[in-house]
């Protein structure tokens, strides 16, 4: 007979929450940036430029997210099979690939910042604000790839609580204080520097988390021999 498996529902929910939190943080960060820009001189043009930039940045985000959705089942299978070598191999591949993808996106956006903004708006003032906003948003864009990869990996190894924490740091815990304070002190320049400042802290936290991820995953996979759960 059909009946819901609450354990399975809980597992699926826990796995999906960090990704949902990242999306929520992106939306909150966008709203707070508009609020921070509102009191500034020429606010209308800044907000219009930021709207264009967000569309472009989200394209890059979706590319990375799509790749990570492919990485997660591979890493999960290796972890569930307690194949330590394959798991760490998949982690290394995902790390390199996510960094490569985000670096490529950043390079393209920085080099083509002006033409890309012109695709959406031809107002020279908006184009000028937009190109600098776009450069500032992707200057340290690998932070997004690294953070999302670490979030997915911590989910995979069962440390969903820490994965949830990582999902909040880039556009939440770190970005929000900067976007609420820097524009008040430095005007539009404060908006330009808010994302790079948050990305620097994100990279530091993620780098410090790699060691514990390796220890937790290795300890979990070595705790029960392969095939023991089938006995």
Model features per residue range: what roles?
Residues 49-113, 144-166:
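Small-residue-rich hydrophobic transmembrane alpha-helices
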Residues 4-32, 59, 63, 134, ...:
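Hydrophobic faces of transmembrane alpha-helices in multi-pass small-molecule transporters and flippases
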Residues 27-53, 59, 77-78, 115-124, ...:
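Helix-terminus/linker motif at the lipid-water interface of multi-pass membrane proteins
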Residues 24, 28-31, 102-110, 145, ...:
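Hydrophobic positions within alpha-helical transmembrane segments of bacterial inner-membrane proteins
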Residues 1-17, 75-140, 181-231:
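Short alpha-helical transmembrane segments in multi-pass integral membrane proteins
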Residues 65-68, 137-156, 162-171, 178, ...:
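Short runs within selected transmembrane alpha-helices of multi-pass transporters and secretion channels
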Residues 31-36, 59, 107, 149-153, ...:
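Alpha-helical transmembrane segments of multipass membrane proteins
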Residues 9-13, 44, 59, 63, ...:
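Hydrophobic alpha-helical transmembrane segments of integral membrane proteins
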């Amino acid at each position: 007979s059909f009946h819901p498996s609450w354990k399975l529902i809980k597992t699926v929910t826990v796995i999906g929450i960090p990704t949902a939190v990242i999306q929520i943080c992106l939306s909150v960060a966008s709203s707070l940036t508009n609020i921070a820009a509102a009191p500034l001189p020429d606010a209308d043009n800044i907000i219009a430029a930021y709207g264009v930039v967000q569309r472009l940045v989200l394209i890059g985000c979706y590319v990375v997210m799509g790749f990570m959705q492919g990485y997660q089942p591979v890493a999960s299978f290796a972890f569930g099979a307690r194949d330590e070598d394959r798991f760490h191999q998949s982690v290394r591949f995902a790390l390199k690939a996510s960094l490569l993808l985000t670096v490529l996106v950043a390079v393209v956006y920085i080099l083509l910042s002006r033409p890309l903004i012109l695709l959406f708006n031809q107002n020279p003032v908006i184009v000028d604000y937009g190109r600098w906003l776009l450069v500032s948003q992707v200057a340290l864009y690998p932070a997004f790839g690294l953070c999302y990869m670490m979030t997915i990996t911590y989910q995979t190894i069962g440390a969903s609580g820490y994965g949830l924490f990582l999902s909040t740091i880039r556009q939440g815990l770190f970005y929000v204080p900067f976007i609420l304070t820097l524009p008040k002190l430095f005007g539009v320049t404060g908006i330009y520097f808010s994302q790079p400042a948050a990305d620097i802290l994100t990279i530091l936290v993620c780098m410090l988390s790699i060691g514990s991820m390796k220890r937790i995953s290795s300890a979990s996979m070595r705790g029960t021999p392969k095939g023991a759960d089938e006995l």
